[in-house]
Amino acid sequence: MKDKSIKVLEFNKIQEILKNYTCTKAGKDIIEDLKPYDSVYEVREHLEETKEAFKLLITKGAPPFEGVYDIRNGIYLAEKGSALLPGQLLKIAAVLRCARRFREYINHKEQEESYRVLENICEGIFSLPKIEEEIFNAIEGEDEIADRASSTLYNIRRSLKEKNYSVRDKINSLVRSYSSYLQENIYTVRRDRYVLPVKAEHKGAVPGLVHDQSSTGATLFIEPMSLVNLNNEIKELMLKEKAEIERILTVLSAKINANITGVKTDANIVWELDFIFAKAKFASEYNCTCPTINDEGIVDIIEGRHPLIDRREVVPISVKLGEEFTSLMITGPNTGGKTVTLKTVGLIHLMAMSGLMIPARENSVISYFNNVFADIGDEQSIEQSLSTFSSHMKNIVEIMDKADENSLVLFDELGAGTDPTEGAALAISILENLRKRGAKIIATTHYSELKAYALRKEGVENASVEFDVETLRPTYRLLIGIPGKSNAFEISKRLGLPDYIIDFARENISNENIRFEELIQNLQEKSIKAQEDARLAENLKLERDKEKKKYEEKLEGLQKVRDNALIDARREAKNIIKEAKEEADKILKDIRQLERMGYSSDARRKLEEERKKLKDKLDSIEEKEIKTVHKGEALKNVKEGDEVLLASINQKVIVLSKPDNKGDVLVQAGIMKITANIKDLRAAKGSNFNSNSSKTKKSKKLNLNLRKVESSVDLRGMDAEEAIYTVDKYLDEAYLGGLGEVTIVHGKGTGVLRKTIMDMLKGHPHVKRYRLGEYGEGGTGVTVVEIK
């Protein structure tokens, strides 16, 4: 990308604005080096990171940048093995804390939107909470080490405090004793030693060491001899304190050095995030959107705004290029906004290719170009010198040397500054050459010859900036498909030029030119009307979309309320089922106890009565849940091989048998074969619950049909293979039926069948534990199994 074009399009001013949104000098340095990226992939990734940061600002508020510093100097010193100052260590700890908090800020919960690019960046954070904690624990301020930094420091400072109390008590006593010899009845400190301000003429009255004198010489600061030892002890303690502080700082600095890779990585990530969120804050402030990026030369800027023009005054422009036409000729009067249009298109492209969201409407399309060339200068003056033409031509020669099919070329007043006939011919030749190379071109011009060139040349389109003749002011709106009109006669008339002069001027223009100008005016009026109608239609569409979105959000909210209600209902049903299961287990244990005591007949009757009560209760829960959750009608007929939805466990199953006279069918759910009733089956195709099946599969679902699962299975008379198949099927049904404990009757016999069954139970997924029956349960002829 040419630096000259970047400068001409004023991208550096965007960089300066961006810097205002950063928190660190390092972030500003990243922005200082910001330029368009080298590939469409990089552009898309950096735009995505900006969009993600923009969404985070909206959904989670400001990122945790509190206390973020530029710690590059501290890192450099630590890497060299130097001991850092307390303030430098504090700043490093603050950056480490910011990195850790940022990881928490970025990480999303399951129901939240994920942020792929930012999460990948934050994956690189080392997170060093131990070092962070040690520094904050040891250092309280820029020059203040906490007492808790070490037990040695704590003891030294406690001793210092005690010694200072002793010295102050003694020196206060001396102040009272020597008050007549002192300038003031106070004590002071010189060079960390307690002294008295003695009048010079009484220096012999206070025996001690002179440490200082006043500027006039009238006062001597004398350390009384009785305080020398105490002051010495205080000085020694202060030296020990200093040495301990240096040791603490050295140890902490060494820990930074030992983890320098992690510290540097975390700091660099924080600074990168500072830069990314600066882009997001800019986008929020300037009402920017994320464009679609292509590498096919297609441009569709919808209501783009120049970000450097006052937002209250800027007029949005819409520009298309690259599909129906690859060159756009913009004509119209001076000060009409032609140059601003060029700069807007160029600057928006530079912003997008640098990973910045653009000041334009949603669904804008930007093409990735290897180069954006801009020949834009101050061409608004009346007189244009040869030197100006030469300067532009030198720039154009350079563009002609480098432009190709992956280039966007912007020309302002191409061919101006020389003879109009020669200038127009030269401009057409330049444009045609670039067009044949495949370059995308937008050019402004005054020349009528270029209007005609655009009209007759395929792939080239005219455009103009709208001018309001009534107010004599441009509206700055871009009209694509309509060549510009000079409006010289209309402007002159409104400014007061006599009609006879204007009429005489018209006579000197050919009828063909007059008809052409009238045609342009007619087209402009129709285009303006069409654009007003289009804007009205667009506003109506936006209003409709807004209302649609509002109702969709309201519907989504109602659906969430419904889903939450269903979850609560299912939770309540599970609790009831759990209580019922526990009650059934208790009854089974009571019955076995009664059987041991010889009350088998009554016990069995009681069991059946209680099981019937449970069945009725659970069936009512099942029916209620199915009616609540599943709106689809139950299937009336199924055949072997059909894939259907088993509503009670919300899972697709395969039908293995035809319904019996009770409506029960055998189905396969994964590796398990279970019995279900046809009333519990729904059509799998188009089911509203298919999308949720992956979520519900993970949680254990209970088959509520207790009436189908007996509390025991009898294997007597079966061979080993048949018994294993029967027990495996039975345990599946017992597990889904929610039974806590079951009995397998295998008989005593030779013990072969018992051993076969026990070997099988050892690794069975549904078995928690098992044992041989006790007296009254069937002894060694049965195995009692506890289900998970």
Swiss-Prot record:
Keywords, in A-Z order: ATP-binding, DNA-binding, Endonuclease, Hydrolase, Nuclease, Nucleotide-binding, RNA-binding, rRNA-binding
Superkingdom per UniProt: Bacteria
Residues binding ATP, per UniProt: 332-339
Enzymatic class: hydrolase
GO terms of biological process kind: mismatch repair; negative regulation of DNA recombination; rescue of stalled ribosome
Role this protein plays: Endonuclease that is involved in the suppression of homologous recombination and thus may have a key role in the control of bacterial genetic diversity. Acts as a ribosome collision sensor, splitting the ribosome into its 2 subunits. Detects stalled/collided 70S ribosomes which it binds and splits by an ATP-hydrolysis driven conformational change. Acts upstream of the ribosome quality control system (RQC), a ribosome-associated complex that mediates the extraction of incompletely synthesized nascent chains from stalled ribosomes and their subsequent degradation. Probably generates substrates for RQC.
HAMAP family associated with the record: MutS2 (MF_00092)
Record family assignment: Belongs to the DNA mismatch repair MutS family. MutS2 subfamily.
Subunit structure, interactors included: Homodimer. Binds to stalled ribosomes, contacting rRNA.
Protein name: Endonuclease MutS2
Species name: Clostridium botulinum (strain 657 / Type Ba4)
Gene symbol of the encoding locus: mutS2
